[in-house]
Amino acid sequence: MAGLKLQAVTKSWDGKTQVIKPLTLDVADGEFIVMVGPSGCGKSTLLRMVAGLERVTEGDIWINDQRVTEMEPKDRGIAMVFQNYALYPHMSVEENMAWGLKIRGMGKQQIAERVKEAARILELDGLLKRRPRELSGGQRQRVAMGRAIVRDPAVFLFDEPLSNLDAKLRVQMRLELQQLHRRLKTTSLYVTHDQVEAMTLAQRVMVMNGGVAEQIGTPVEVYEKPASLFVASFIGSPAMNLLTGRVNNEGTHFELDGGIELPLNGGYRQYAGRKMTLGIRPEHIALSSQAEGGVPMVMDTLEILGADNLAHGRWGEQKLVVRLAHQERPTAGSTLWLHLAENQLHLFDGETGQRV
């Protein structure tokens, strides 16, 4: 059995409306899973269910072969790191890290050894006597993680731990979390609304929407083969271009609303005549020419980002974003002739929104 298993778990506040639809997830021992999605999608509620802070309406939760569905949080073998550091301001770093073990009745020598080891791992050795007010935001977050590490849990639960940090510190802490997981190899479940955190930290990503796991897969899988329109629109910056239209009667072209036809790379005859949504990432559209069969787009604006540029335009009433090389800087109002990589096209069912 996996290090952590959610088996058809649901959550309902009123006994009728499910805020978590039946959800099953197997997390291997030592695996790092990130739950990502917009505010209100249910990811933090699900994490709190694993922690025992919210009751499971239906289904079961298992940690290391033990059913913990009704078990008290303190008995589940979990340690949680929150968005707010929740450090005791009157205690030193050392005392904050040791406090949870002390109230559990652990011996002083064992506590000292665990705190010393956690401080070494997190490079807090020289800060053990300081108070939280004397620390930076990144140092406070490391203390919060140290407090979790000393418990030697079966599972780490992270609830948006980097949200309060500035952009530069978030990058640094992402790297430190990666290094920490490689060192400890503890099963981890991590919640964030930030897709960059999800893609850089996760071994597998669970994309959530409306209490449903839209897709579970590696970061590469959810980026390259999104299972639904929601995943396609949520993962990626800028988001995937999504264009509505229909597959022509021969299954050879996609007819955009507005009359533009785009060639399809075969295998779509069974969808002939059906309303669909075509997706393509901005980096899979290249500049071409009319002679080479390019499709024209009048550019509205150009975003210069430094390493590359983003050209914004329209096909009819549908918006399109194209990622250009650093040296490609067309002027607003100019016509760009575009070539779409046929092997990078994604088709989604017009009714269900699911990938076909």
UniProtKB/Swiss-Prot annotation:
Entry's EC annotation: 7.6.2.10
Disruption phenotype: Mutant lacking this gene fails to grow on both glycerol-3-phosphate and glycerol-2-phosphate.
GO terms, molecular function: ABC-type glycerol-3-phosphate transporter activity; ATP binding; ATP hydrolysis activity; glycerol-3-phosphate transmembrane transporter activity; glycerophosphodiester transmembrane transporter activity
GO BP terms, alphabetized: carbohydrate transport; glycerol-3-phosphate transmembrane transport; glycerophosphodiester transmembrane transport
CDD domains in the cross-refs: ABC_MalK_N
Alphabetized UniProt keyword annotations: ATP-binding, Cell inner membrane, Cell membrane, Membrane, Nucleotide-binding, Sugar transport, Translocase, Transport
Membrane topology designation: Peripheral membrane protein
Residue positions binding ATP: G37, P38, S39, G40, C41, G42, K43, S44
Top-rank EC class of the record's enzyme: translocase
NCBIfam families recorded: PRK11650.1
Family, as annotated: Belongs to the ABC transporter superfamily. sn-glycerol-3-phosphate importer (TC 3.A.1.1.3) family.
Job of this protein: Part of the ABC transporter complex UgpBAEC involved in sn-glycerol-3-phosphate (G3P) import. Responsible for energy coupling to the transport system. Can also transport glycerophosphoryl diesters, which are hydrolyzed to G3P and alcohol during transport. The G3P moiety can be detected in the cytoplasm whereas the corresponding alcohol is usually found in the culture medium. It was proposed by Yang et al that the complex could also transport glycerol-2-phosphate (G2P) in vivo, but it was shown later by Wuttge et al that UgpB does not bind G2P, questioning this transport activity.
The protein, known as: sn-glycerol-3-phosphate import ATP-binding protein UgpC
Lineage: Bacteria, Pseudomonadati, Pseudomonadota, Gammaproteobacteria, Enterobacterales
